[in-house]
Amino acid sequence: MNQEKKDLLYFALGVLLVTTLIVASFPLLHITSNWAANALMFVPGSIAALLLLLRRESLRPIGWGLGPARYWLVGIVLPTLMILVAVVISLRLGYAAPAPASTPHGSLIVHPAKLVKNMLLYFVISLPLAFGEEFGWRGYAQPRLIRQFGLVSGLLALGIIWGFWHTPIYYVMHWYSEHPLLGPFVMTPIDNILVVVPMAWLYIRSKNIWVPTFTHAFADILWGFSGLMFPATHEIQNWVVLQVVQAIVSAVLLMDLLSKRQQSIAPELRESPASA
């Protein structure tokens, strides 16, 4: 096993173990706040920063420029369309329903100005949290996994690690009330395996960490508010609709990343000799 593979193993184990140990203390300390769980988004980036420091590796390859404006636009349009399509389909099929207008969440549907204000507030709060994850997942792990295992296997591995990193958080915080085991241990990893491709595409094409950070925060806010305003009446069916939408988008973007033209643009997609 070469050094880069060892570092990836240290990263994965460190992220999973640290997160699990912290979350395991929540019931003992009577912590039920979602903000405490959200703070764990800094764990992947912190572990990555520690490994980079120990190896004395440069931060420059992560990409700190702003990149072309078109990828910022994609970062807005793509999650908006995906969630919009999924919500509309779920509403039509009866898998979700609008929250009553008399409730705080339902009132946002008929008060768009209030909705935008709340979304902007939470978006600003979410940006540093999203950076904590993206620095670790995209900035550190993704290019190394692709070099060592190739594009498809590397992204699959990243999606699995990313998904199971969420598992203890979602399990302890009871975020899948109807399916407390299936949700965290099966549905969440599948969700992250599918969403890892659009995030990888944005990072590779934009060549900077800010576009996936922005998209991560923006998508989290859209997903969160859509779930509050249009709660699921059938949790699994509603989830399946979103996964089908994500699978279609991921297939298209993965084919683009696998194309010869894209590999000529992004040489990092080619497997490194060090992976042998």
What are these regions (language model features)?
Residues 205, 215-276:
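C-terminal membrane module of polytopic membrane proteins
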Residues 17, 132-159, 204-208:
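Membrane-interface helix/loop boundary segments of multi-pass membrane proteins
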Residues 7-21, 43-45, 74-83, 161:
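Alpha-helical transmembrane segments
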